[in-house]
From Swiss-Prot:
Start and end residues of each UVR domain: 204-239
UniProt-recorded name of the protein: UvrABC system protein C
InterPro entries linked to this entry: DisA/LigA_HHH, GIY-YIG_endonuc, GIY-YIG_endonuc_sf, GIY-YIG_UvrC_Cho, RuvA_2-like, UVR_dom, UVR_dom_sf, UvrABC_protein_C
Function: The UvrABC repair system catalyzes the recognition and processing of DNA lesions. UvrC both incises the 5' and 3' sides of the lesion. The N-terminal half is responsible for the 3' incision and the C-terminal half is responsible for the 5' incision.
Domain of life: Bacteria
One Gene Ontology CC term in the entry: cytoplasm
NCBIfam families associated with the record: PRK00558.1-5 (NF001824), uvrC (TIGR00194)
Gene3D superfamilies: 5' to 3' exonuclease, C-terminal subdomain (1.10.150.20), GIY-YIG endonuclease (3.40.1440.10), UVR domain (4.10.860.10), UvrC, RNAse H endonuclease domain (3.30.420.340)
GIY-YIG domain location: 13-92
GO biological process, one term: nucleotide-excision repair
Keyword Acetylation attributed: no
Subunit structure: Interacts with UvrB in an incision complex.
Alphabetical keyword list: Cytoplasm, DNA damage, DNA excision, DNA repair, Excision nuclease, SOS response
Length: 618
């Protein structure tokens, strides 16, 4: 049993990281402290003016643990790593923890390539980015390939290597074939230098050079060459237009600001590379009404740069907490100097004001869309309540489905909709353990039993410990259950609920002969819902989502065994013959279509095994 009083008394006066846990042992908050003793005790002192969010967290703390570090910077590094690992409920978490794409020029190679990557390493390459839009990176690389004859293959080509036959790209003029030694390293590097100039925003020099060559070609009556150069000039100018110069310097900088409306906050980030905006991104954090902006920005930086592949030389913010400590952490991550600056006036300040305006517009648009959707979903839930004659609107809806292919790897899925919106954080997957073969009814009974058994256990644990109601994995029960099937599936669900003495309405979602949502079955009666357009769309969405989620899980489980359910069940087909069949025919469909003679052409196949394959797929 965790003795809170004893643990608080014995906290060390050293720097470190603390982890708050709920009654289920889940880590709900990770924080760092210069002095653990002082920081952790503050949470449990009634005299402290805690925010509503902190008060809610403290009510759910069942125990805590801590890790001592040698310094505050070590504590910060560990805190960021643990937040990334555990994704605690009460930490500020960015929903889009993504690595942005970069354009990479592989300068460490004798004959460099231009490729897309999401990982920045010190490998001698030159990186351009980040770009928020992955398709933009792809477009730029494709345009570069059309303009500059550089290689796209992954071969390890060195200048002194033995020449090999060039590929089709050489024949159509897209590559100078360094693999065949048709171009020297120094000449190839001149082309790469032009690519780097273009990506660095110095495209006007390249355009001028191309124009001179175009004019010479026209004077010499080489009109085809002149037209080709004209097209390349257009492509280069198109790439240049993709990035807008807003500063006269050519530093790599990020500008971060925020806008709060009293309840929620929108963070906006502008990425400037070589004086150009190469992208921007926003993040909306809910329920920040009682947190000051400097704390919000400090927490945002830890989360954002803890997951990004690139840290710029300078980061501009309107204000910040722990500035020196965060600078030290960023510099360690970057392995070169990174500075946080708060501009007071001038063009840097003007850009930050622009970033804040964008954050304000983004949050307002988000709220407007949210209100519009809320009104729509409110009407859907009201209509659903009336159609089914329920006592209350079904605020939380859970839908269940079973997926299997050829009777193997049966899996179950549960998707959740709250207030009309999908809630992926509450989705659950079940691998069927007790049922062999394709038996959807028994499989459904298993997953429903497990779902509500876990839920009741969690509720009992919460009540026994006299804690505030905690959102465990299964402890929140639905107001309505939707089954992807008819009366048989409904009866299974009701049987499970009755066994646990739980009273929840159960509905079946039925489809027509074209596999489109047709209506609902409730209390033994089929209800046609096509006259309720918004309800029809909502039920179709739920049905599609639960099916998609089940199928995606099934595919992930099959993995390398995706052919197991068929080939392994054919008599006289062992591991060797299975591999040979797949190697030669490439797919199950091709094996199904194979003739007797084609099967016998495989060295490991004999007459009997070929006949077995034909008989199996007959």
């Amino acid at each position: 049993m965790f003795d809170l009083e004893y643990q608080l008394k014995n906290l060390p006066d050293k720097p470190g990281v603390y982890l708050m846990k709920n009654n289920l042992g889940e880590i709900i908050y990770v924080g760092k402290a210069k002095i653990l003793k002082n920081r952790v005790r503050q949470y449990f002192q009634k005299s402290q003016k805690h925010s509503e969010k902190v008060k809610a967290m403290v009510k759910n703390i069942e125990e805590f643990e801590y890790i001592i570090t040698d310094s505050e910077i070590e504590a910060l590094i560990l805190e960021c790593n643990l937040i990334k690992k555990y994704r605690p409920k009460y930490n500020i978490l960015l929903k889009d923890d993504k690595h942005y794409p970069f354009i990479k020029v592989t300068l460490a190679e004798d004959f460099p390539r231009v490729i897309s990557t999401r990982k920045v390493t010190k490998d001698g390459s030159k990186y351009f980015g980040p770009y928020v839009d992955g398709s933009s990176v792809k477009d730029i690389i494709e345009l570069i390939k059309k303009t500059f004859p550089i290689r796209t293959c992954k071969k390890n080509i060195v200048e002194e290597a033995k020449a090999i036959r060039p590929c089709l790209n050489y024949q159509i003029g897209l590559c100078k074939a360094p693999c065949a030694q048709y171009i020297k390293k120094s000449e190839y590097r001149e082309t790469i230098d032009d690519v780097i100039k273009l990506l660095s925003g110095k495209h006007l020099d390249i355009v001028e050079n191309f124009k001179l060559n175009m004019e010479k070609a026209a004077e010499n009556l080489e009109f085809e060459k002149a037209a080709m150069l004209r097209d390349k000039i257009n492509i280069i100018e198109k790439i240049g237009e993709k990035q807008k110069i807003i500063l006269n310097n050519f530093d790599n900088e990020d500008y971060i600001s925020l806008y709060s409306d009293g309840k929620d906050t929108c963070f906006q980030v502008f990425f400037l590379r070589n004086g150009k905006i190469v992208g921007r991104e926003h993040f909306i954090i809910e329920d920040t009404f009682d947190t000051n902006s400097s704390t919000l920005i400090s927490n945002f930086l830890k989360e954002f740069y803890g997951g990004t592949a690139y840290i710029p030389k300078t980061i501009y913010v309107p204000n910040i907490e722990d500035e020196a400590l965060l600078e030290q952490w960023l510099t360690l991550k970057k392995e070169s100097k990174s500075t946080i600056k708060i501009p007071i006036k001038g063009e840097k300040k003007n850009i930050l004001v622009l970033v804040e305006k964008n954050a304000k517009t983004t949050l307002e648009n988000f709220k407007l869309k949210y209100l519009q959707e809320k009104a729509l979903y409110d009407n859907v839930l009201k209509d659903l309540k009336n159609i089914l004659r329920l006592q209350e609107e079904p605020i939380r809806i859970e839908a269940f489905d079973i997926s299997n292919i050829q009777g193997f790897d049966s899996v179950g899925s549960m998707v959740v909709f709250e207030k009309g919106r999908a809630k992926p954080s509450d989705y659950r997957r079940f691998k069927i353990n007790t049922v062999k073969g394709a038996d959807d009814y028994k499989s459904m009974k298993e997953i429903l039993t497990r779902r509500f058994q876990h839920g009741l256990s969690e509720i009992k644990s919460i009540q026994d410990r006299k804690l505030e109601f905690s959102s465990g994995k299964f402890s929140v029960f639905p107001d309505l259950i939707l089954m992807d099937g008819g009366k048989g599936q409904i009866n299974i669900a009701l049987e499970v609920l009755n066994a646990f003495n739980i009273d929840i309405p159960v509905c079946g979602m039925v489809k027509d002969n074209k596999h489109r949502t047709r209506g609902l079955i409730y209390n033994g009666e089929e209800i046609i819902i096509n006259k309720y357009g918004s309800v029809m769309k909502f039920i179709t969405r739920v049905q599609d989502e639960v099916h998609r989620f089940a199928i995606s899980y099934h595919r992930s489980l099959r993995g390398k065994n995706s052919f197991h359910s068929l080939l392994d069940d054919i008599p006289n087909i062992g591991e060797k013959r299975k591999k040979d069949l797949l190697f030669n025919f490439k797919s199950i469909d091709n094996i199904k279509k194979a003739t007797y003679e084609e099967l016998l052409s495989i060295p490991s196949m004999d007459k009997k095994s070929a006949e077995c394959v034909l008989e199996f797929f007959k």
